[in-house]
Amino acid sequence: RESGVRQLERQLGAVARKVARRVAMGDTATIDDKVISSDEVRELLGRPKVHPERLAEHDEVGISTGMYYTPMGGDIMFVEASIRRGSSAPLKHDDGADVVRVGPISLILTGQLGDVMKESARAALTYATNNAALLGIPADRVASASEAHIHVPAGAIPKDGPSAGIAIALALVSEMSNRKVRRDVSMTGEITLRGRVLPIGGVKEKVLGAHRAGIKEVIIPKANEADLEDVPDEVREQLIFHPVETMREVLAIALVDQGRAAPIEVDELIGV
């Protein structure tokens, strides 16, 4: 989990020095098989200092699984949505959270979201409310909604970019329609007001992070199909990919009671 391998080199050096010290002191048990086990690595280097996200334990309403990448690598992230009903909420919360009005609904954004990600959240809410009937959202749920709260955990870490758009839209539709989201599906893609899914960057890193987290199926923009060629064969073979062009395709795949779209085999995607 770093840009390059400098820290990895340091840790390998630390392991080698500690093993050499044991050998010098007459303890050769560690190198009998010339292999150091994971338990011995923990003993030599201490507890892990990086704790990547793992697959959620249950399918839940209002929580979707997005994907992101940084120079340190890719990972999954959870997007949480909550809808409050009743009288209109104020445009400024006392806690300083970002609040904007989308029609009659106040949109609250927390989790240190950047400007581009905030715009994606607004687009996602507009799409969900404008297409409520088509998306299976009861009319009374939209009419009575006064506040939509989007939160992306790990609040101390700044987050930005458009690629969480479909994950935000999915969490909102799930919350407003009271339908669970599949926990084993992660996704990345920008959303438009009309529900189109646009291409994004970092597909390889995001897919590797999702695979490491235990994800089984990945939704990507159809325009990013060719980027799957960069994903190692051993990872591609263990995942099912769904290239999509519209948000309705995302919902058909990711909502538990919507049925599962037929998986697309990697060979069909990239012609290998």
Please give the residue ranges for each predicted region.
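Extended amphipathic alpha-helical scaffolds
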Residues: 16, 20-80
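Alpha-helix C-capping/helix-to-loop hinge sites
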Residues: 2-3, 22, 26, 238
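Short, surface-exposed helix-loop/turn micro-motifs enriched in polar/charged residues
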Residues: 4-7, 30-33, 139-142, 183
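The conserved phosphate-sensing helix
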Residues: 1-17, 73
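Peripheral, non-AAA+ core regions of ATP-driven protein-machinery
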Residues: 51-55, 59-60, 64, 73-272
